[in-house]
Amino acid sequence: MAELYIDADACPVKAEAERVAVRHGARMYLVSNGGIRPPAHPLVESVFVPEGPDAADKWIADRAGTGDVVVTSDIPLAAKAVAAGALVVKPNGETLTTANIGNALATRDLMADLRSADPFRQGGGRPFSRADRSRFLDALERAMRKAAEAARDAGQDEAGT
């Protein structure tokens, strides 16, 4: 069965992800260093990791694999999850795959270099929108179906069928 891992710190789509996970009967892990409400549904588990750089990312990367779905905006975590065979969906609905994760990493690094070169630069990305939320729900639904299929196929392969 597919599992859903949410990089929950500052994730704007936790409630939407929970609804999709429950509908699919999938276990969901909300991974953060605190500050989120415990979920009410038994399929949804809050995982609190120690404060520190990338503790939530490490927890997710150590567990996610083929047949799982990871929701994150963190590109290095997404790269690790993709390498492990997981499907990755960003909160804006963009999917990250082996075909595009290299470009995403390069763009991230370039933008970090540009920001560090201009200390007076202000602003950030555009605000999260209803359209982003809608794209996310569509992408997560497709990813959960694909992950369930991959998990089913992996189970059949292990059973020798």
Curated annotation (Swiss-Prot):
Highest taxon, organism lineage: Bacteria
Pfam family name, one: DUF188
Disulfide bonds listed in the record: none
Family designation: Belongs to the UPF0178 family.
HAMAP family for this protein: UPF0178
Name of the protein described by the UniProt record: UPF0178 protein Rsph17025_3122
Biological source species: Cereibacter sphaeroides (strain ATCC 17025 / ATH 2.4.3) (Rhodobacter sphaeroides)
